[in-house]
Structures are given as C-alpha cells and as structure tokens.
Amino acid sequence: MLAIISPAKTLDFESAVPKFEFSQPQLTEYSAQLIDVCRQLSPAEIGSLMSISDKLAGLNFARFAEWQKAHTEQNSRAAIYAFKGDVYTGLDVESLSQQDVLFAQQHLRMLSGLYGLLKPLDLMQPYRLEMGTKLVNSKGKDLYAFWGNVITDTLQQAIEAQGDNVLVNLASDEYYKSVKESQLNVRIIKPVFLDNKNGKYKVISFYAKKARGLMCRYIIQNRLSEVEQLKGFDLGGYWFDPTSSSETEFVFKRDVAE
C-alpha cells in the first residue's frame, strides 16, 4: 500500500531533525530544468506568477538563485520534516517513532511542483512552486505539461515495489492532476472526510486537510497492508460510513471536531 499527499507552502528549516540515513530525491535532473526557468524571472514576475507579496517574491527569488543540484545535510532537509501545514499537523511526524518514519519511507510519497515525487527522507531545499503554477517551460504552458508522464511512471515503480498495487490518494486535486490515473496499473482508494455543519455533512477544507494527515498517521502507525483495514480509521473522531462509500471512495464522517 502506497499513500500520496500534497506538499505544503509553509516550510521549517530551523528546528532539530532526528538522525537518519537520508535519501536523495529521484528527479533532480527535472528539478534543475525548472530552476533554470525560474531563475530567468524577476522578483516582480515571481510575485505576479504566484500571486504572493513582494516580500515572499524576494525570498523565493533568492531561493531559486541559491538552489543547488547537489543535496546535502548542510543545504537541505528531509521532506517529511520540512513541510508544515494542515496535512502535516495531522501527520505530526515529530511524535512518530524512528521505525514509523522508516515505514513511511516505504509507504508514503509527497507530490511536488519542483521535485515531482518525494520520499519522506528525501533531502530537499527550500522552495515554493505549486503544481498549479502556470510556469511556461520547454514542455508547455504549465507544470502539468512539464512533468508529463514522469510523475506517473515514478509512482508506478514505487507502487510495484509494494507488491499489492494499492494507491491511497490523500492528495489535493491540484496535485493529483499531475498523476495520469488511467496509465496506472493499480487499485486507487480515495478517502473523503466530511464534517457535520448545521446538520449536513460536507468537506470543510481545513478539517479535511488535517484528516488526510491523520489517515497517513493511521496507515503508518498500524502498518496497514490491506484495503479493508483503512475502514478502521477513527482518529480525530471520524468514523467510516459504508452507506456513503463505494469501491473506490471511502467516506469518513465526523459529528464534532476534536
């Protein structure tokens, strides 16, 4: 079983990280091509392209300039410890054991606009490049055109290494669009998280993002290997609703936010 999640815009390159044998990102040849494109942009162009403030545009202009193809523990950080956001709040990697993180290294992947696909312990340098960014490049008008089949092929290899051909899609639509689902030889399960608001169950973005992280945590800590085991997810007060679910979409509901 392999789970995929989105990255986060907020990064942490300051706090202490446990000692691990870190891995290298697999697709840096492609990352370097994107960096070359981004280095041609002025801070103002970066701000306009990404709809961010002048301050953030300046920061990312500097990040693109400083990015190096060689990833070391001096200039990089393991992806699972670098991303901070709602999904990663739910995952709460800091409280996972070393064995949990090593399990995640085999069973979790993060989609990325710059790196394509990351393993949890892959070293990455600070960047901001969301998958939906309309960055014109040699392959086309945006990052979906740039990545083409690369992410899908890399993901297929990772799934085959699991031996059970099951993909749990916990990524946002923006990022999952980079995966060509029809080309994957795999059973795909999409968990959906609904919260009760005024008597109706609906997706509430903040809660749903955190729940995706909680589901990752559940898979990791319980060493899940069977699709049916996903239905036992009960973190944060969620429960599996079989009547709203299908073969491919597992619906989890919650009445009161915890």
From Swiss-Prot:
GO terms for cellular component: cytosol. GO terms for biological process: response to hydroperoxide. This is UPF0246 protein PM0066. Coiled coil: none annotated. It comes from the Bacteria. Pfam families: H2O2_YaaD. InterPro entries: YaaA (IPR005583). Belongs to the UPF0246 family. It comes from Pasteurella multocida (strain Pm70).
